[in-house]
Amino acid sequence: QHEPSRREAAVRHAASAPAAFRRFQVGSADALAGDLAALQAALGDFHRTHYVARRMQLWLQGPQSLEALGELAARFAAGLAAGEAPPPAPPLRLGEFTALQLAVSSQPALWRCPLIALSDNVTLLREFLLDEAPGSLMAGLRQRRLAGDVALNWLYQDRHLGWLALVFASDRPEEVDRQITHWLQALQQTTPEQQLHYYQLSRRRFQALSPLDQLRQRAFGFAPGAPPAGFADFCAALQAAPSVSLACQTVSPGESVATQGFSLPLSRWRRRPESDPALGFAFYPQAAGDLVAKCPEKAAPLLHLPSPGEPPRLLLRPPFYCSPDQAEGLARGEQLRPQLAALRHAGGHGEWHLFDGSWQLTLQLPEPGRRPEAILQAILRQLALPVASLTPPPESIAIRHLIAQLPERLGTSGHQKGWLAALAGGSAEDAQWIARQLSLITAPVNPPMPAPAPCRRGVERLVYPGGDTALLVFIPLPDGASLAALRLLA
């Protein structure tokens, strides 16, 4: 069964009303008693009742005017039966037991799910929650090894009420739960300037999405609304709101609870007393003086590709065919997370990612006049520090596993230390400033490249943890004649 659905079902089991929260969700053909005609009739009745104009919402987003979008909506709705309006949603009530424990075999987590009045402040809360810069909740939890990742989702919404789910990947739920409370208290002390800063970050996050993802956020997620208002009161209400806590822990399963078509090893969560000190929270923006650092005198060689009007974008990557493996690359990304998030607060953007089989760091620097020397220097110093490899998540598709291994298997030259650096956009002055920052890297920058060696040949067999098998054939085409010959063979 789908593990995220099992966990969501465990949370919904804590709702005593309406009864729909515990109704049948999944099952096998045997559970339907084999009566296919009755199933088809029930599905038809459901469709005729609910797939009608008065019970549906249509969301449109596009470059057209509101009038044009309205005409498109009217044209779509013309083919729908009007139907009956839905009855008012019954109030959501939680049951007697709201602290639950679910036995799991892997991926322990904490779900903290408060019932709150709908508010635009939820999107602002999400921006604070997803922040990874030094002083944030997630940076502190990772530093103490209390949690790995976080997500915020809606479990339910009606016209006035919302049921949120704050989901933390953690095997220490008591400590994380306590720090969430401390964090909500700290958020109540944020200033209007700080709240506006995070609101603007939420708008940047939204604008970076594709049009389809923007539409999804408007309909089901956390699209930015009005500027912050009453955020401290919202956080206080959130802290005091009725909520469900679910600790997903790797413990021996006890008796199972049948709910929503699942059989869940669900029990009461008996919290252990914890007295860990609160994390030291800090919120942004930083004072301008905190971004200034002494500029090195020496300069490293830097390839500059001018592009008039474009902001400076720095690309750093290991020499060709010398990229770290996936385990080391993932660990480097974890190491860089706080400083890349700090760069985002300063008006820039950074990403450590895999591109065509090689790990690379892309830094979009802020507008001219806003040079975060301290942040950039901290990022560059991180590149010289060793990292402990992380176990990469298993690839569920065999051919993707082979494709991911291909660049490393094709490499023939020995490992070469150093970094390749290039700057796209920006002015000559920007290039000079960045070249001086790059001199902080202890390894060679843009070292001479050895002559490329021919690609490996032959057949190589790789062990795949799954049960599938796959064959990948790679044929390098060094010139146009080879490509033409291959096309003739095809």
Language-model segments: what does each one mean?
Residues 130-170, 337-355, 472-477, 490:
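A structural supersecondary motif
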Residues 32-33, 57-60, 126, 165-171, ...:
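Second-shell loop/turn segments in exported
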Residues 238-325, 329-337:
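Segments forming glycine/polar-rich beta-alpha architectures that bind adenosine-containing cofactors
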Residues 118-129, 308-352, 377-379, 473, ...:
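Active/ligand-binding-proximal structured segments within catalytic/core domains
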Residues 66-71, 172-178, 254-258, 324-327, ...:
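Short, conserved charged micro-motifs
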Residues 21, 52, 57-112, 260-287, ...:
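An aromatic/glycine/proline-enriched structural segment found at the starts
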Residues 48-54, 156-162, 308-311, 352-358, ...:
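Short, flexible turn/loop "capping" segments at secondary-structure junctions
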Residues 1-46, 137, 148-152, 178-224, ...:
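Acidic/histidine-enriched segments that form metal/cofactor-coordinating
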